[in-house]
Amino acid sequence: MKREILLERIDKLKQLMPWYVLEYYQSKLAVPYSFTTLYEYLKEYDRFFSWVLESGISNADKISDIPLSVLENMSKKDMESFILYLRERPLLNANTTKQGVSQTTINRTLSALSSLYKYLTEEVENDQGEPYFYRNVMKKVSTKKKKETLAARAENIKQKLFLGDETEGFLTYIDQEHPQQLSNRALSSFNKNKERDLAIIALLLASGVRLSEAVNLDLRDLNLKMMVIDVTRKGGKRDSVNVAAFAKPYLENYLAIRNQRYKTEKTDTALFLTLYRGVPNRIDASSVEKMVAKYSEDFKVRVTPHKLRHTLATRLYDATKSQVLVSHQLGHASTQVTDLYTHIVSDEQKNALDSL
Protein backbone atom coordinates (compact mmCIF):
# COMPACT_ATOMS: atom_id res chain seq x y z
CA MET A 1 0.00 0.00 0.00
CA LYS A 2 1.34 3.42 -0.92
CA ARG A 3 2.43 5.50 2.07
CA GLU A 4 0.04 8.35 1.22
CA ILE A 5 -2.96 6.00 1.07
CA LEU A 6 -1.86 4.27 4.28
CA LEU A 7 -1.64 7.58 6.15
CA GLU A 8 -5.05 8.63 4.85
CA ARG A 9 -6.60 5.41 6.15
CA ILE A 10 -4.86 5.83 9.49
CA ASP A 11 -6.23 9.37 9.82
CA LYS A 12 -9.77 8.13 9.13
CA LEU A 13 -9.48 5.48 11.83
CA LYS A 14 -7.93 7.92 14.31
CA GLN A 15 -10.97 10.17 13.94
CA LEU A 16 -13.12 7.30 15.27
CA MET A 17 -10.98 6.44 18.29
CA PRO A 18 -11.28 7.43 21.98
CA TRP A 19 -8.66 9.80 23.39
CA TYR A 20 -6.71 7.03 25.16
CA VAL A 21 -6.24 5.10 21.91
CA LEU A 22 -4.92 8.28 20.28
CA GLU A 23 -2.44 8.60 23.17
CA TYR A 24 -1.44 4.98 22.65
CA TYR A 25 -0.95 5.62 18.94
CA GLN A 26 1.28 8.63 19.60
CA SER A 27 3.34 6.70 22.14
CA LYS A 28 3.93 3.75 19.81
CA LEU A 29 4.77 6.07 16.94
CA ALA A 30 7.66 7.31 19.08
CA VAL A 31 9.05 3.77 19.63
CA PRO A 32 8.73 3.65 16.58
CA TYR A 33 6.13 1.13 15.45
CA SER A 34 5.72 1.11 11.68
CA PHE A 35 2.70 2.85 10.17
CA THR A 36 1.64 -0.53 8.77
CA THR A 37 1.61 -2.12 12.23
CA LEU A 38 -0.28 0.80 13.75
CA TYR A 39 -2.82 0.72 10.92
CA GLU A 40 -3.49 -2.98 11.55
CA TYR A 41 -3.86 -2.30 15.29
CA LEU A 42 -6.30 0.56 14.68
CA LYS A 43 -8.41 -1.74 12.50
CA GLU A 44 -8.52 -4.26 15.35
CA TYR A 45 -9.57 -1.55 17.82
CA ASP A 46 -12.31 -0.44 15.46
CA ARG A 47 -13.55 -4.03 15.33
CA PHE A 48 -13.42 -4.39 19.12
CA PHE A 49 -15.05 -1.08 20.03
CA SER A 50 -17.80 -1.62 17.44
CA TRP A 51 -18.62 -4.87 19.22
CA VAL A 52 -18.55 -3.07 22.60
CA LEU A 53 -21.29 -0.74 21.34
CA GLU A 54 -23.31 -3.48 19.62
CA SER A 55 -23.24 -5.75 22.67
CA GLY A 56 -24.40 -3.02 25.02
CA ILE A 57 -21.30 -3.13 27.23
CA SER A 58 -21.13 0.62 26.68
CA ASN A 59 -24.11 2.85 26.02
CA ALA A 60 -21.96 5.51 24.37
CA ASP A 61 -23.26 6.95 21.11
CA LYS A 62 -20.05 6.36 19.19
CA ILE A 63 -16.63 4.74 19.58
CA SER A 64 -14.83 7.98 20.44
CA ASP A 65 -17.17 8.45 23.44
CA ILE A 66 -16.44 5.05 25.03
CA PRO A 67 -14.97 5.92 28.45
CA LEU A 68 -11.75 4.45 29.81
CA SER A 69 -13.75 2.86 32.63
CA VAL A 70 -15.29 0.41 30.13
CA LEU A 71 -11.86 -1.12 29.50
CA GLU A 72 -10.98 -1.00 33.19
CA ASN A 73 -14.13 -2.91 34.16
CA MET A 74 -14.13 -5.33 31.23
CA SER A 75 -14.52 -8.84 32.62
CA LYS A 76 -12.89 -12.05 31.45
CA LYS A 77 -16.37 -13.25 30.53
CA ASP A 78 -16.85 -10.15 28.34
CA MET A 79 -13.60 -10.84 26.49
CA GLU A 80 -14.54 -14.46 25.97
CA SER A 81 -17.87 -13.31 24.54
CA PHE A 82 -15.96 -11.12 22.10
CA ILE A 83 -13.81 -14.07 21.03
CA LEU A 84 -16.92 -16.19 20.47
CA TYR A 85 -18.39 -13.35 18.43
CA LEU A 86 -15.31 -13.34 16.20
CA ARG A 87 -15.36 -17.11 15.86
CA GLU A 88 -19.05 -17.51 15.11
CA ARG A 89 -20.21 -14.37 13.33
CA PRO A 90 -20.90 -14.62 9.56
CA LEU A 91 -18.05 -13.34 7.43
CA LEU A 92 -18.61 -10.10 5.57
CA ASN A 93 -17.51 -11.81 2.36
CA ALA A 94 -20.78 -12.73 0.65
CA ASN A 95 -19.03 -15.33 -1.54
CA THR A 96 -18.50 -17.74 1.33
CA THR A 97 -20.73 -19.53 3.80
CA LYS A 98 -17.87 -19.98 6.27
CA GLN A 99 -18.66 -18.76 9.77
CA GLY A 100 -16.25 -16.61 11.76
CA VAL A 101 -12.67 -15.55 11.27
CA SER A 102 -9.58 -17.77 11.49
CA GLN A 103 -7.71 -18.46 14.71
CA THR A 104 -4.79 -16.52 13.26
CA THR A 105 -7.01 -13.45 12.89
CA ILE A 106 -8.35 -13.89 16.43
CA ASN A 107 -4.80 -14.11 17.79
CA ARG A 108 -3.90 -10.93 15.91
CA THR A 109 -6.91 -9.13 17.41
CA LEU A 110 -6.02 -10.27 20.93
CA SER A 111 -2.39 -9.27 20.41
CA ALA A 112 -3.48 -5.74 19.50
CA LEU A 113 -5.74 -5.54 22.55
CA SER A 114 -2.98 -6.89 24.80
CA SER A 115 -0.69 -4.13 23.56
CA LEU A 116 -3.30 -1.48 24.34
CA TYR A 117 -4.02 -2.88 27.80
CA LYS A 118 -0.32 -3.12 28.63
CA TYR A 119 0.08 0.53 27.69
CA LEU A 120 -2.90 1.62 29.83
CA THR A 121 -1.99 -0.50 32.89
CA GLU A 122 1.83 -0.35 32.86
CA GLU A 123 3.37 2.14 30.46
CA VAL A 124 1.35 5.36 30.51
CA GLU A 125 1.63 7.90 33.35
CA ASN A 126 -1.08 10.20 34.68
CA ASP A 127 -0.37 13.43 36.58
CA GLN A 128 0.65 11.40 39.63
CA GLY A 129 3.02 9.21 37.64
CA GLU A 130 0.68 6.22 37.80
CA PRO A 131 -0.94 4.20 34.98
CA TYR A 132 -4.57 4.95 34.15
CA PHE A 133 -5.67 1.72 35.86
CA TYR A 134 -4.09 -1.54 37.02
CA ARG A 135 -6.47 -4.35 36.16
CA ASN A 136 -5.35 -6.00 32.89
CA VAL A 137 -8.06 -8.43 31.81
CA MET A 138 -6.00 -9.53 28.80
CA LYS A 139 -3.61 -11.38 31.13
CA LYS A 140 -6.50 -13.72 31.94
CA VAL A 141 -7.41 -14.44 28.31
CA SER A 142 -5.85 -17.53 26.73
CA THR A 143 -4.97 -17.75 23.05
CA LYS A 144 -4.83 -20.87 20.97
CA LYS A 145 -1.79 -21.10 18.76
CA LYS A 146 -1.74 -23.03 15.53
CA LYS A 147 -0.20 -26.44 16.18
CA GLU A 148 2.43 -27.40 13.66
CA THR A 149 5.75 -29.12 14.20
CA LEU A 150 8.92 -27.63 12.77
CA ALA A 151 9.24 -30.66 10.52
CA ALA A 152 5.74 -30.08 9.11
CA ARG A 153 6.39 -26.38 8.63
CA ALA A 154 9.71 -27.12 6.93
CA GLU A 155 7.98 -29.54 4.57
CA ASN A 156 5.39 -26.89 3.64
CA ILE A 157 7.96 -24.16 3.09
CA LYS A 158 10.79 -25.92 1.28
CA GLN A 159 8.79 -26.37 -1.93
CA LYS A 160 8.60 -22.58 -2.17
CA LEU A 161 12.30 -21.89 -1.72
CA PHE A 162 14.82 -21.27 -4.48
CA LEU A 163 17.73 -23.30 -3.13
CA GLY A 164 21.05 -24.20 -4.71
CA ASP A 165 21.36 -23.07 -8.32
CA GLU A 166 17.73 -21.92 -8.36
CA THR A 167 18.60 -18.64 -6.61
CA GLU A 168 20.69 -17.32 -9.47
CA GLY A 169 18.56 -19.33 -11.90
CA PHE A 170 15.55 -17.26 -10.86
CA LEU A 171 17.43 -14.02 -11.55
CA THR A 172 18.70 -15.31 -14.89
CA TYR A 173 15.17 -16.31 -15.83
CA ILE A 174 13.84 -12.80 -15.17
CA ASP A 175 16.75 -11.23 -17.03
CA GLN A 176 16.88 -13.45 -20.11
CA GLU A 177 13.99 -15.91 -20.48
CA HIS A 178 10.97 -14.02 -19.15
CA PRO A 179 11.23 -11.23 -21.79
CA GLN A 180 11.02 -13.80 -24.59
CA GLN A 181 7.50 -14.78 -23.48
CA LEU A 182 6.10 -11.25 -23.60
CA SER A 183 4.16 -9.40 -26.25
CA ASN A 184 5.70 -6.22 -27.63
CA ARG A 185 3.50 -4.10 -25.38
CA ALA A 186 4.26 -6.16 -22.28
CA LEU A 187 7.96 -6.19 -23.15
CA SER A 188 8.01 -2.39 -23.30
CA SER A 189 6.48 -2.22 -19.83
CA PHE A 190 8.90 -4.85 -18.50
CA ASN A 191 11.95 -3.02 -19.83
CA LYS A 192 10.97 0.20 -18.03
CA ASN A 193 11.60 -1.41 -14.65
CA LYS A 194 13.74 -4.43 -15.49
CA GLU A 195 16.90 -3.22 -13.73
CA ARG A 196 14.98 -2.10 -10.66
CA ASP A 197 13.01 -5.34 -10.37
CA LEU A 198 16.14 -7.45 -10.68
CA ALA A 199 17.97 -5.29 -8.12
CA ILE A 200 15.16 -5.63 -5.56
CA ILE A 201 14.81 -9.39 -5.97
CA ALA A 202 18.59 -9.89 -5.94
CA LEU A 203 18.86 -7.84 -2.76
CA LEU A 204 16.13 -9.85 -1.02
CA LEU A 205 17.76 -13.13 -2.05
CA ALA A 206 21.25 -11.94 -1.11
CA SER A 207 20.51 -10.32 2.25
CA GLY A 208 17.37 -11.90 3.69
CA VAL A 209 15.99 -8.53 4.79
CA ARG A 210 12.26 -8.12 5.35
CA LEU A 211 10.18 -6.51 2.62
CA SER A 212 9.54 -3.43 4.77
CA GLU A 213 13.27 -3.07 5.41
CA ALA A 214 14.04 -3.22 1.70
CA VAL A 215 11.44 -0.72 0.49
CA ASN A 216 12.41 1.75 3.24
CA LEU A 217 16.06 1.82 2.19
CA ASP A 218 17.47 5.17 1.16
CA LEU A 219 20.28 5.63 -1.34
CA ARG A 220 22.70 6.48 1.47
CA ASP A 221 21.94 3.14 3.19
CA LEU A 222 23.67 1.15 0.45
CA ASN A 223 27.46 0.72 0.56
CA LEU A 224 28.12 -0.98 -2.76
CA LYS A 225 31.88 -1.20 -2.20
CA MET A 226 31.51 -3.10 1.08
CA MET A 227 28.22 -4.79 0.03
CA VAL A 228 26.48 -3.70 3.21
CA ILE A 229 23.09 -2.07 3.74
CA ASP A 230 21.90 -0.17 6.82
CA VAL A 231 18.31 -1.07 7.66
CA THR A 232 15.75 -0.20 10.31
CA ARG A 233 14.69 -3.42 12.01
CA LYS A 234 11.49 -4.11 13.92
CA GLY A 235 11.29 -1.84 16.94
CA GLY A 236 13.22 0.90 15.17
CA LYS A 237 16.69 -0.58 15.73
CA ARG A 238 19.31 0.23 13.11
CA ASP A 239 21.36 -2.67 11.81
CA SER A 240 24.08 -3.23 9.21
CA VAL A 241 23.40 -6.22 6.99
CA ASN A 242 25.88 -7.97 4.72
CA VAL A 243 24.78 -8.64 1.14
CA ALA A 244 26.00 -11.62 -0.89
CA ALA A 245 28.27 -10.72 -3.80
CA PHE A 246 25.98 -12.16 -6.50
CA ALA A 247 23.63 -9.18 -6.03
CA LYS A 248 26.30 -6.59 -6.86
CA PRO A 249 25.96 -6.50 -10.68
CA TYR A 250 22.18 -6.18 -10.41
CA LEU A 251 22.48 -3.28 -7.97
CA GLU A 252 25.12 -1.62 -10.15
CA ASN A 253 22.94 -1.92 -13.25
CA TYR A 254 20.01 -0.33 -11.42
CA LEU A 255 22.06 2.53 -9.99
CA ALA A 256 23.45 3.25 -13.46
CA ILE A 257 19.95 4.02 -14.80
CA ARG A 258 18.17 5.20 -11.62
CA ASN A 259 18.54 8.96 -11.99
CA GLN A 260 17.72 9.24 -15.68
CA ARG A 261 15.04 6.53 -15.83
CA TYR A 262 13.13 7.77 -12.78
CA LYS A 263 13.80 11.50 -13.29
CA THR A 264 15.22 11.97 -9.83
CA GLU A 265 16.08 15.15 -7.98
CA LYS A 266 18.24 15.60 -4.89
CA THR A 267 15.15 15.28 -2.70
CA ASP A 268 14.43 11.75 -3.99
CA THR A 269 16.34 9.82 -1.35
CA ALA A 270 14.61 6.43 -1.67
CA LEU A 271 16.81 3.68 -3.11
CA PHE A 272 14.06 1.93 -5.05
CA LEU A 273 11.73 4.16 -7.02
CA THR A 274 8.64 4.00 -9.16
CA LEU A 275 7.46 6.62 -11.64
CA TYR A 276 3.85 7.79 -11.43
CA ARG A 277 2.71 10.51 -13.82
CA GLY A 278 6.29 11.55 -14.30
CA VAL A 279 6.97 11.92 -10.58
CA PRO A 280 9.38 9.56 -8.77
CA ASN A 281 8.12 7.94 -5.56
CA ARG A 282 9.43 5.33 -3.17
CA ILE A 283 8.21 1.92 -4.32
CA ASP A 284 5.63 0.45 -1.92
CA ALA A 285 5.51 -3.04 -0.43
CA SER A 286 2.42 -4.15 -2.34
CA SER A 287 4.10 -3.38 -5.68
CA VAL A 288 7.06 -5.56 -4.73
CA GLU A 289 4.75 -8.35 -3.56
CA LYS A 290 2.95 -8.34 -6.90
CA MET A 291 6.23 -8.24 -8.79
CA VAL A 292 7.73 -11.17 -6.88
CA ALA A 293 4.50 -13.16 -7.26
CA LYS A 294 4.42 -12.59 -11.03
CA TYR A 295 8.03 -13.53 -11.74
CA SER A 296 8.14 -16.47 -9.33
CA GLU A 297 4.92 -18.00 -10.66
CA ASP A 298 6.30 -17.87 -14.20
CA PHE A 299 9.61 -19.38 -13.05
CA LYS A 300 8.54 -22.15 -10.69
CA VAL A 301 5.95 -21.44 -7.99
CA ARG A 302 4.20 -18.32 -6.76
CA VAL A 303 5.95 -17.02 -3.63
CA THR A 304 6.03 -13.97 -1.39
CA PRO A 305 9.07 -11.79 -0.63
CA HIS A 306 9.20 -13.48 2.79
CA LYS A 307 9.95 -16.79 1.07
CA LEU A 308 13.01 -15.12 -0.47
CA ARG A 309 14.08 -14.31 3.09
CA HIS A 310 13.60 -17.99 4.01
CA THR A 311 15.64 -18.93 0.93
CA LEU A 312 18.63 -16.85 2.02
CA ALA A 313 18.41 -18.14 5.60
CA THR A 314 18.28 -21.77 4.48
CA ARG A 315 21.19 -21.37 2.06
CA LEU A 316 23.26 -19.56 4.70
CA TYR A 317 22.62 -22.26 7.29
CA ASP A 318 23.42 -24.97 4.75
CA ALA A 319 26.76 -23.29 4.06
CA THR A 320 27.74 -22.48 7.66
CA LYS A 321 25.71 -24.79 9.93
CA SER A 322 25.61 -21.81 12.30
CA GLN A 323 22.24 -20.79 13.71
CA VAL A 324 23.89 -17.83 15.45
CA LEU A 325 25.19 -16.45 12.15
CA VAL A 326 21.79 -16.91 10.50
CA SER A 327 20.07 -15.19 13.44
CA HIS A 328 22.37 -12.20 13.15
CA GLN A 329 21.84 -11.99 9.40
CA LEU A 330 18.05 -11.98 9.83
CA GLY A 331 18.09 -9.56 12.76
CA HIS A 332 16.74 -12.02 15.33
CA ALA A 333 17.81 -11.77 18.97
CA SER A 334 17.42 -15.53 19.50
CA THR A 335 18.38 -18.63 17.53
CA GLN A 336 15.00 -20.23 18.29
CA VAL A 337 13.44 -18.75 15.15
CA THR A 338 16.17 -20.31 13.01
CA ASP A 339 15.39 -23.88 14.13
CA LEU A 340 13.18 -24.12 11.04
CA TYR A 341 16.16 -23.94 8.70
CA THR A 342 17.92 -26.88 10.35
CA HIS A 343 14.91 -29.05 9.46
CA ILE A 344 14.83 -27.83 5.85
CA VAL A 345 18.56 -28.47 5.40
CA SER A 346 18.26 -31.93 7.02
CA ASP A 347 15.59 -32.83 4.47
CA GLU A 348 17.79 -31.57 1.64
CA GLN A 349 20.72 -33.66 2.90
CA LYS A 350 18.50 -36.74 3.11
CA ASN A 351 17.33 -36.19 -0.47
CA ALA A 352 20.95 -35.90 -1.59
CA LEU A 353 21.82 -39.18 0.14
CA ASP A 354 18.82 -40.93 -1.39
CA SER A 355 20.02 -39.95 -4.85
CA LEU A 356 23.44 -41.60 -4.39
From Swiss-Prot:
InterPro entries: CB (IPR044068), DNA_brk_join_enz (IPR011010), Integrase-like_cat_sf (IPR013762), Integrase_catalytic (IPR002104), Integrase_recombinase_N (IPR010998), Integrase_SAM-like_N (IPR004107), Recomb_XerS (IPR023670), Tyrosine_recombinase_XerCD (IPR050090). GO terms for molecular function: DNA binding; tyrosine-based site-specific recombinase activity. One of its GO terms (biological process) is cell division. Keywords: Cell cycle, Cell division, Chromosome partition, Cytoplasm, DNA integration, DNA recombination, DNA-binding. It comes from the Bacteria. Pfam families: Phage_int_SAM_1, Phage_integrase. The active site is at 210, 234, 306, 309, 332, 341 (o-(3'-phospho-dna)-tyrosine intermediate). The keyword Cell cycle applies. FtsK is required for recombination. Residues 169-354 form the Tyr recombinase domain. Residues 16-121 form the Core-binding (CB) domain. Signal peptide: none annotated. It is found in: Cytoplasm. One of its GO terms (cellular component) is cytoplasm. Belongs to the 'phage' integrase family. XerS subfamily. Site-specific tyrosine recombinase, which acts by catalyzing the cutting and rejoining of the recombining DNA molecules. Essential to convert dimers of the bacterial chromosome into monomers to permit their segregation at cell division. NCBIfam families: PRK05084.1 (NF003462). This is Tyrosine recombinase XerS. It comes from Streptococcus pneumoniae (strain ATCC 700669 / Spain 23F-1).
